[in-house]
UniProtKB/Swiss-Prot annotation:
Signal peptide: none annotated. It is an enzyme of class 2 (transferase). It comes from the Bacteria. HAMAP family: RNApol_bact_RpoC (MF_01322). Binds 1 Mg(2+) ion per subunit. Binds 1 Zn(2+) ion per subunit; 2 are expected compared to other E.coli strains. It comes from Escherichia coli O6:K15:H31 (strain 536 / UPEC). Transmembrane segments: none annotated. Keywords: Acetylation, DNA-directed RNA polymerase, Magnesium, Metal-binding, Nucleotidyltransferase, Transcription, Transferase, Zinc. The lineage of its organism: Bacteria, Pseudomonadati, Pseudomonadota, Gammaproteobacteria, Enterobacterales. GO terms for biological process: DNA-templated transcription. This is DNA-directed RNA polymerase subunit beta'. Pfam families: RNA_pol_Rpb1_1, RNA_pol_Rpb1_2, RNA_pol_Rpb1_3, RNA_pol_Rpb1_4, RNA_pol_Rpb1_5.
């Protein structure tokens, strides 16, 4: 018996492995896997249902059909195991060997493997350096290929048609060797000398100069080297033996009625075997060449179909006209092996049901129906029943449970106590979509859910369903309790704010409770404390809203963390005093002494968590909920039609608007305004009228007039139910109330244009048929949009998770000094995001100094928590350099200091945290809230876009950065630099506003001057770009010849004449090469130099420039010499919402990107070509100039002779992230992507921490291109993993050699996922065939570093609680110990969990 157990145990243990290698299989290898050759296409005998011998299901090859029983029945039972029956030849063993034993087919003629032939780029084609078409013609027997030229004039690999071959045969006889079919290709591959070829190509690479040739050569060298290094032989890409999949993986199941259901693979295999056998017979008979050839072609096609059906030609179809599923189809796509079975599996011990509210539950509980619990916990109940001796056997226990005896329910109670269950609601968009709860048994059939976790699940009770899972092992229960319990997930991992926040009823209840009311019952009383307040309210002697004085005892934490009591009399209301009873000790009374809206409640919970920690917060949240529900019920707030008060003014506002519209209509008919202007004006009028109506309505709802105690009238905030719901943030918004009681306003047509007659009615008045019809479009579009949005958002999340899945925190501190400069986000006149929000929870990269001094305010490597941020604000610091994931130097993963605070826990992040996945979920989860549309700018919006001045909002002093300016004749500053920024600094030195100032703007105030709020500080003409002189003197025209380069135009209205420079297209032949310019000379006619340089002041004029000066006029610096009209860019669509985020992460180039200067230097224009001009930048140090062709229609921001810095904008447009990376570096591109993504989310009011976006950017910057290989093994121009280059360079520099130089690459997230080092991860993402083909040829090893690879091969992931296991494995391997038995005991699990949890508190000491 013992050895039997040993035998069974030995069967279950799997090998431990560190990596997975994929390579080409040699024919011998295939034969070594095989247990026999499949010779017949038969499958099962349809009468006996026994497999046919030598067929596709043969028991002799693949193993017995029944456990421990041979086919003929001679040997049965376990005692014969291992015997091979002499009659039927079947080995007596378990039947599961039919899942692992393979067979093979000896092919009568070699066959090309379609993956290496047709998967682009074709590996066979690249290796032989032959075009794919030629190879195909050879393989499918259309032409011959020369294998050995011999002494003839035929080249090796030359393609010959049938006629050419016959001619050559006549001419040379058997001097040469030419064949067709796969044999020919096989012969060519066999005769290749890879190493010699490699040498030859490297020599060629050094000699050649052409870019395309280099690219092609590098590709071939890489492929050849891969073959040499991996030990793959090229001829193995041609199959001579075909492996046969084990039969249980391609089952054949008899249905009732004598028919069979079968896997498509069986059909495909049968085809191959049939054709192969026919070919063998033809060869034995020495049939005519043409017949054999045809049969060989058919065999090739059959094998192609088996490997990848439909890749070449038409797909082979089955009986029902649908293409058969080949081996390639089995693994790729959503239904393939990777995504269907390896990355997502179905789980046992689970149930699902509808959810309902459980308002009486505690936060860590959920209500579980008894029926469900009984079913889910069955094994536990059986065990307990046996343990108690209530049932003798499992069978008896089963009977008891089925009969539902009374004792079973008692046992169930015991089993369930302290055994958490997991609740999951699909779609699980972030990690809070699965949380653990303690079950409470309930009657009924619906799961009860705690109302506060609804926000995290995004659940409501209109029929949502949820799934329950039972964690079985002790470790699983421990993890569920310690990490996944709902009470441990109070903060959202996306932004670190509480996610357990009351909403709807609870908010309304608390708001109602904390409102005050003039002259309420009991006003003016003085009470001894909250208890008395409650007594008075309960006995009906005082109203909840009465303004009273109450004695309140507050507790405050002192320096030692002790609570100190402080009692005082507070002006407050009865309701607030009652609410104070549930507030935990340690919070100030001011927290509840206000009308509590949703924001205030959220802030209250956040403060509680930061001051008092987790436990009090959880208890407080529960109390808030119970109280809120109770008082919401007491309030009796409900919606009646009379609550929607329509303002009296509405009628007159609308009639005024109608009168204005009629007036504009008259103007249009008399031809004073164009149709477009009329339309825009009408829409503006109605939009304004709508705003006026809604303002009147809100004013009306907001306040009511009441009589106070002294009998005077007094205004107070209204108790209108609808208004209270909106004001508290419980439900609804001003915009929705406007539709109920104001007017519905303007509607859009299906094409997106606005209908100029608005819906003047509201929902209380009701809509007429036309109005109803107009509004149906918007409603329907909303629904269609939502459906599209969900799919797109899900796909974005999938790509993000895929690119970031292997990023894990792997060490505590790498000691990087690099970092990102953080400044507040300021757009125009308002601070969109203050500095504290951006740096909270980050680690400083260098000491932060007190502004204006050398005192250190915050030392380097400090985790900035709330108190530090307060300190920064007090000292008005407006820039802090913080560590960032993008600049972290850790090789694989990142260090904890570069990441900073774990947002969901509030302390520095632990090692082993999967920050990549968290980042992906945080960005993807709000994706469904983003809009899908692109904004068409037209009408009112476009006119506001052309700004012409800067008006500041606050008072303060002006600060100009990177500015060049001159003073004009009237003493004002004129800006002559391109990217000038104007900031407004308040008296504390904080930046309040920030504006871009264009070239040629005239400043009213200089740098450092004080301004008052509302003052205009800069003006410019938005429609023309001036040319400003920087020196004083006399104007001298050069090359300005009337009729050739310029033409005179006279303005009809003013009679002034001006010169217009002709575009080179409009000039005569003689004027083509002339360069019209204005030169500034002094009184003696000598050139005036530009100050600070030795360049004469000469201003070249582009085409269309307008000059309003005459030759020889005197001018002074800062004057306008010429004006260049700016064509406004027309109406450009702005991509917004989800598509914009996807574009940023995919790093797509915009349609017309900004042109940036590649190097620093002086701009000049070279010879023009048709439609393009040549921009030349000459560096000051005299190195090679840089040239670029720019289309004529691009508006340039620079003049000839101007100096530009590398990365400056030469022509406006959206900037391409690749250019930013190349010219301004990693930090600039990070800043760009983070800010752009945040802009989209900020518009929708979604808060996401910058960290998450930086994590994705780090993954987009994973690759680098080698510029110069140095002494390394890399090829020039090769794209390699950035960490590999860093490691290689470190080793080279340690040995005193020259490292490789490289440039960082920015890849889109899809590209980056496919370019990962792990082929398993890439194959399970997209383009499975291509990835696997590439990996096999290169003989890639997958080191199983990421999470996805480990999930696929079925072991613990190297993150979270699995991190310790992997670290332990690494340590053991380094020490050379035997790998430990994989089973982890319960004690180990609890110990490692404790260690993980403590690491967060005190930091673990075992490194």
């Amino acid at each position: 018996m013992k050895d039997l157990l040993k035998f069974l145990k030995a069967q279950t243990k799997t090998e431990e492995f560190d990596a997975i290698k994929i390579a080409l299989a040699s024919p011998d290898m295939i034969r070594s896997w095989s247990f026999g050759e499949v010779k017949k296409p038969e499958t099962i005998n349809y009468r006996t249902f026994k497999p046919e011998r030598d067929g596709l299901f043969c028991a002799r090859i693949f193993g017995p059909v029944k456990d421990y029983e041979c086919l003929c029945g001679k040997y049965k039972r376990l005692k014969h195991r291992g015997v091979i029956c002499e009659k039927c030849g079947v080995e007596v063993t378990q039947t599961k060997v039919r899942r692992e034993r393979m067979g093979h087919i000896e092919l009568a003629s070699p066959t090309a493997h379609i993956w290496f032939l047709k998967s682009l780029p074709s590996r066979i084609g690249l290796l032989l350096d032959m075009p794919l078409r030629d190879i195909e013609r050879v393989l499918y027997f259309e032409s011959y290929v020369v294998i050995e030229g011999g002494m003839t004039n035929l080249e090796r690999q030359q393609i010959l048609t049938e006629e050419q071959y016959l001619d050559a045969l006549e001419e040379f006889g058997d001097e040469f060797d030419a064949k067709m079919g796969a044999e020919a290709i096989q012969a060519l591959l066999k005769s290749m000398d890879l190493e010699q070829e490699c040498e030859q190509l490297r020599e060629e690479l050094n000699e050649t100069n052409s870019e395309t040739k280099r690219k092609k050569l590098t590709k071939r060298i890489k492929l050849l080297e891969a073959f040499v290094q991996s030990g793959n032989k090229p001829e193995w890409m041609i199959l001579t033996v075909l492996p046969v999949l084990p039969p249980d993986l391609r089952p054949l199941v008899p249905l009732d009625g004598g028919r069979f259901a079968t896997s498509d693979l069986n059909d495909l295999y049968r085809r191959v075997i049939n054709r192969n056998n026919r070919l063998k017979r033809l060869l034995d008979l020495a049939a005519p060449d043409i017949i054999v050839r045809n049969e060989k072609r058919m065999l090739q096609e059959a094998v192609d179909a088996l490997l990848d059906n439909g890749r070449r030609g038409r797909a082979i179809t089955g009986s029902n006209k649908r293409p058969l599923k080949s081996l390639a189809d089995m693994i790729k796509g959503k239904q393939g092996r990777f995504r269907q079975n390896l990355l997502g599996k179905r789980v046992d011990y689970s149930g699902r049901s509808v959810i309902t509210v459980g308002p009486y539950l505690r936060l860590h509980q959920c209500g579980l129906p008894k029926k469900m619990a009984l079913e889910l916990f069955k094994p536990f109940i059986y065990g307990k029943l046996e343990l108690r001796g209530l049932a003798t056997t499992i069978k008896a226990a089963k009977k008891m449970v089925e009969r539902e005896e009374a004792v079973v329910w008692d046992i169930l109670d015991e089993v369930i106590r302290e055994h958490p269950v997991l609740l999951n609601r699909a779609p699980t968009l972030h990690r809070l979509g699965i949380q653990a709860f303690e079950p409470v048994l309930i009657e009924g059939k619906a799961i009860q859910l705690h109302p506060l976790v609804c926000a995290a699940y995004n659940a409501d009770f209109d029929g949502d369903q949820m799934a329950v899972h039972v964690p079985l092992t002790l470790e699983a229960q421990l993890e569920a309790r310690a990490l996944m319990m709902s009470t441990n997930n109070i903060l959202s991992p996306a932004n670190g704010e509480p996610i357990i926040v009351p909403s709807q009823d609870v908010v309304l209840g608390l708001y109602y409770m904390t409102r005050d009311c003039v002259n309420a019952k009991g006003e003016g009383m003085v009470l001894t404390g909250p208890k008395e307040a409650e007594r008075l309210y309960r006995s009906g002697l005082a109203s909840l809203h009465a303004r009273v004085k109450v004695r309140i005892t507050e507790y405050e934490k002192d320096a030692n963390g002790e609570l100190v009591a402080k009692t005082s009399l507070k002006d407050t209301t009865v309701g607030r005093a009652i609410l104070w009873m549930i507030v935990p000790k340690g919070l100030p009374y001011s927290i509840v002494n206000q009308a509590l809206g949703k924001k205030a409640i959220s802030k209250m919970l956040n403060t509680c968590y930061r001051i008092l920690g987790l436990k009090p917060t959880v208890i407080f949240a529960d109390q808030i909920m119970y109280t809120g529900f109770a008082y919401a019920a007491r309030s009796g707030a409900s919606v009646g039609i009379d609550d929607m008060v329509i303002p009296e003014k509405k009628h007159e506002i609308i009639s005024e608007a109608e009168a204005e519209v009629a007036e504009i209509q008259e103007q249009f008919q008399s031809g004073l305004v164009t149709a477009g202007e009329r339309y825009n004006k009408v829409i503006d009028i109605w939009a304004a009228a709508n705003d006026r109506v809604s303002k009147a309505m809100m004013d009306n709802l907001q306040t009511e007039t009441v009589i106070n105690r002294d009998g005077q009238e007094e205004k107070q905030v209204s108790f209108n139910s609808i208004y209270m719901m909106a004001d508290s943030g419980a439900r609804g918004s001003a915009a929705q109330i406007r539709q109920l009681a104001g007017m519905r306003g303007l509607m859009a047509k299906p094409d997106g244009s606005i209908i100029e007659t608005p819906i003047t009615a509201n929902f209380r008045e009701g809509l007429n048929v036309l109005q109803y019809f107009i509004s149906t479009h918007g409603a329907r579009k909303g629904l269609a949009d939502t459906a599209l949005k969900t799919a797109n958002s899900g796909y974005l999340t999938r790509r993000l998770v895929d690119v970031a899945q292997d990023l894990v925190v792997t060490e505590d501190d790498r000691g990087t000094h690099e970092g990102i400069m953080m400044t507040p986000v300021i757009e125009g006149g308002d601070v969109k995001e203050p500095l504290r929000d951006r740096v909270l929870g980050r680690v400083t990269a260098e000491d932060v100094l007190k502004p204006g001094t050398a005192d250190i305010l915050v030392p380097r490597n400090t985790l900035l928590h709330e108190q530090w941020c307060d300190l920064l604000e007090e000292n008005s610091v407006d820039a802090v350099k913080v560590r960032s994931v993008v600049s972290c130097d850790t090789d694989f993963g990142v260090c904890a200091h570069c990441y900073g605070r774990d947002l969901a826990r509030g302390h520095i992040i632990n090692k082993g945290e999967a920050i990549g996945v968290i980042a992906a979920q945080s960005i993807g989860e709000p994706g469904t809230q983003l809009t899908m549309r692109t904004f068409h700018i037209g009408g009112a919006a476009s006119r506001a876009a052309a700004e012409s001045s800067i008006q500041v909002k606050n008072k303060g002093s002006i600060k100009l950065s990177n500015v060049k300016s001159v003073v004009n004749s009237s003493g004002k500053l004129v800006i002559t630099s391109r990217n000038t920024e104007l900031k407004l600094i308040d008296e504390f030195g904080r930046t309040k506003e920030s504006y871009k100032v264009p070239y040629g703007a005239v400043l009213a105030k200089g740098d450092g001057e004080q301004v008052a709020g509302g003052e205009t500080v800069a003006n410019w003409d938005p429609h023309t770009m001036p040319v400003i002189t920087e020196v004083s003197g006399f104007v001298r025209f050069t090359d300005m010849i009337d009729g050739q380069t310029i033409t005179r135009q006279t303005d009809e209205l003013t009679g002034l004449s001006s010169l217009v420079v002709l575009d080179s297209a409009e000039r005569t032949a003689g004027g083509k090469d002339l360069r019209p310019a204005l030169k500034i000379v002094d009184a003696q006619g000598n050139d005036v130099l530009i100050p600070g340089t030795d360049m004469p002041a000469q201003y070249f004029l582009p085409g269309k420039a307008i000059v309003q000066l005459e030759d020889g006029v005197q001018i002074s610096s800062g004057d306008t010499l010429a004006r260049i009209p700016q064509e406004s860019g027309g109406t450009k669509d702005i991509t917004g919402g989800l598509p914009r985020v996807a574009d940023l992460f995919e790093a797509r180039r915009p349609k017309e990107p900004a042109i940036l200067a590649e190097i620093s230097g002086i701009v000049s224009f070279g010879k023009e070509t048709k439609g393009k001009r040549r921009l030349v930048i000459t560096p000051v140090d005299g190195s090679d100039p840089y040239e670029e062709m720019i289309p004529k229609w691009r508006q340039l921001n620079v003049f000839e002779g101007e100096r530009v810095e590398r990365g400056d904008v030469i022509s406006d447009g959206p900037e391409a992230p690749h250019d930013i990376l190349r010219l301004r570096g990693v930090h600039a591109v990070t800043r760009y992507i983070v800010n752009e993504v945040q802009d989209v989310y900020r518009l929708q009011g979604v808060k996401i921490n910058d960290k998450h976006i930086e994590v994705i950017v780090r993954q987009m910057l994973r690759k680098a291109t080698i510029v110069n290989a140095g002494s390394s093994d890399f090829l020039e121009g090769e794209q390699v993993e950035y960490s590999r280059v860093k490691i290689a360079n470190r080793e080279l520099e340690a040995n005193g050699k020259v490292g490789a130089t490289y440039s960082r690459d920015l890849l889109g997230i899809t590209k980056a996922s496919l370019a990962t080092e792990s082929f398993i991860s890439a194959a399970s993402f997209q383009e499975t065939t291509r990835v696997l083909t590439e990996a096999a040829v290169a003989g890639k090893r997958d080191e199983l570093r990421g999470l996805k690879e480990n999930v696929i091969v079925g072991r613990l992931i190297p993150a979270g609680t699995g991190y310790a296991y992997h670290q332990d494995r690494m340590r053991r391997r380094a020490a050379g110990e035997a790998p430990a038995a994989p089973q982890v005991t319960a004690e180990d699990a609890s110990a490692s969990l404790a260690e993980l949890l403590n690491a967060g508190l005190g930091g673990s000491d075992n490194e």
